[in-house]
């Protein structure tokens, strides 16, 4: 995303009155954070053998002062913790692997996500947002999914449900 596109994204974020925006497939290199006038950008990219898989969170300046910290975990997930009352809020942005990824890569993804969850205090409110590249289907899994999903469940969807059930 070039500077011009970043400005368009920031304008659209303001138009729809959102304070936090997640982005997948950003196409920037490196990792870090920077101030962009009325927004703060956290991003992480590591070039893989297959392609670049970047994630970012763009935070409006209205809530930037509430940021307690950021973890740039890897090119597929980052987290930002916001001070809240009565609880802090942890936002984890993910970009999951596609169904043709190696099983070891998928295991690594969920292990890294588990690491981030373990760093999140139990009392914090947790939001895991992003692109899961999964279809969970319409079958209800009590405590995890409702019966209003779409399509047929795929392997990535089953793996996501299992992860949610274990960590619920």
Regions found by a protein language model. Give the residues of each.
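A shared catalytic/ligand-binding motif for oxyanion handling
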Residues: 1-168
């Amino acid at each position: 995303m070039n500077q011009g596109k970043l400005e368009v994204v920031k304008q659209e974020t303001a138009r729809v009155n959102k304070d936090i925006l997640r982005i997948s497939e950003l196409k920037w290199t490196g990792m870090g954070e920077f101030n962009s006038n009325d927004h703060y950008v956290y991003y992480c990219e590591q070039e893989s053998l297959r392609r670049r898989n970047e994630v970012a969170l763009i935070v409006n300046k209205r809530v930037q002062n509430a940021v307690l910290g950021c973890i740039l975990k890897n090119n597929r997930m980052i987290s930002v913790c916001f001070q809240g009352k009565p609880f802090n809020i942890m936002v984890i942005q993910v970009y999951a692997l596609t169904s043709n990824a190696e099983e070891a890569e998928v295991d690594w993804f969920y292990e890294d996500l588990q690491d981030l969850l373990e760093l999140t205090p139990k009392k914090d409110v947790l939001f895991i947002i992003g692109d899961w590249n999964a279809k969970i289907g319409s079958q209800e899994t009590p405590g995890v999914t409702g019966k209003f999903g779409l399509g047929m469940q795929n392997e990535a969807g089953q793996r996501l449900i299992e992860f949610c059930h274990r960590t619920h």
